[in-house]
């Protein structure tokens, strides 16, 4: 039987331990911000909540969401970017320009070392915003042409090509599963992943083009239409800021792919810190088989 005196000492010790440990554990959580509100994909409210859940479930992030007005410009859209370690964009094609003050604040935030993640149609947004296109490296649609920058892809013989040929930026075929090929297995985002793995049903973006400055292609997917290996994961250095860009993630089912979930969360952590400790899960897809987790949406 434990004496009252011993029990009191034990409880006191536990209290000291919790006092010491809890703040440290809380400090490990990074603050993330998802911005959304205008997207040509009608499921954007669901994908915002899915991505929020993925980040929070990793136990690495706390997440806030700031939503732009649904139509036209929104003078009140002024997120406090500096309060966050990473910003995730779930905007899409045709999104109205942000207020000039907000654009400048975002540029300063990323240039000064803030993290940024561009998901799927976020690379359709803001074709006239020079700094934004430098951040995402490559974009599509919105009138992007050879004036926007080169096409970037891998050839069959494994060479990275910067193609300045004339033509529009951005295209995709019917949705289907497709294979992802890792091009840099040593990068913190891709380290430990299979050399090739199957991504679930999605749009395979092709013919993206843009400044492609300070950009590394981490992974590609072969596009039968272009006969090129199109970028599916990219990192871009913008000033002191780190950017992770994935064109994947069209539909809810696309974002339920364990490959998408893992690369998205790892990409966000890398953008925020430059390091990754989120593990590659046991149910990660293989070269032969996709793997998905049904979400509540």
Identify the function of each model-found stretch:
Residues 22-26:
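Sec/Tat signal peptide C-region and signal peptidase I cleavage site
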Residues 11-21:
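Bacterial N-terminal signal peptides
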Residues 2-12:
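Bacterial N-terminal signal peptides that target proteins for export
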Residues 38-41, 165-168, 175-177, 249-258:
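Active-site rim elements
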Residues 27-30, 46, 56-57, 79, ...:
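Extracellular ligand-binding/catalytic regions of CAZymes and related secreted enzymes
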Residues 56, 62-64, 72, 153-239:
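Catalytic beta-strand/loop cores that center a nucleophilic Ser/Cys/Thr
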Residues 27, 31-126:
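Helical hinge/lid and interdomain linker segments adjacent to catalytic or ligand-binding clefts
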Residues 96-188:
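A glycine-rich, often tryptophan-bearing local segment used as a flexible ligand/cofactor-contacting loop or short
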């Amino acid at each position: 039987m434990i004496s009252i005196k011993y029990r009191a000492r034990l409880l006191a010790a536990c209290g000291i331990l919790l006092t010491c440990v809890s703040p440290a554990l809380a400090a490990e959580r990074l603050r993330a911000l998802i911005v959304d509100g205008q997207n040509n994909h009608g499921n954007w409210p669901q994908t915002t909540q899915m991505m929020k859940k993925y980040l929070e479930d990793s136990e690495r992030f706390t997440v806030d969401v700031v939503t732009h007005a649904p139509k036209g410009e929104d003078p009140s859209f002024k997120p406090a970017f500096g309060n966050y370690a990473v910003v995730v964009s779930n905007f899409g094609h045709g999104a109205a320009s942000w207020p000039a003050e907000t654009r400048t604040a975002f540029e300063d935030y990323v240039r000064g070392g803030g993290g940024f993640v561009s998901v799927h149609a976020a690379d359709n947004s803001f074709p006239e915003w020079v700094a934004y296109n430098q951040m995402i490296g490559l974009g599509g649609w919105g009138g992007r042409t050879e004036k926007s920058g080169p096409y970037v892809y891998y050839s069959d013989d494994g060479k990275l090509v910067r193609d300045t040929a004339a033509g529009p930026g951005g295209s995709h075929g019917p949705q289907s599963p497709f294979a992802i090929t890792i091009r840099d297995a040593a990068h913190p985002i891709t380290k430990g992943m299979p050399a090739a793995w199957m991504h679930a049903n999605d749009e395979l973006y092709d013919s993206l083009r843009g400044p492609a400055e300070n950009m590394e292609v981490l992974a590609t997917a072969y596009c039968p239409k272009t006969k090129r290996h199109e970028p599916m994961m990219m990192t871009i250095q913008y000033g002191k800021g780190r950017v992770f860009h994935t064109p994947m993630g069209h539909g809810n089912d696309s974002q339920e792919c364990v490959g998408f979930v893992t690369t998205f969360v790892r990409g966000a952590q890398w953008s925020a810190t430059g390091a990754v400790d989120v593990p590659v899960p046991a149910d990660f897809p293989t070269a032969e088989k996709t793997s998905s987790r049904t979400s509540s949406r």
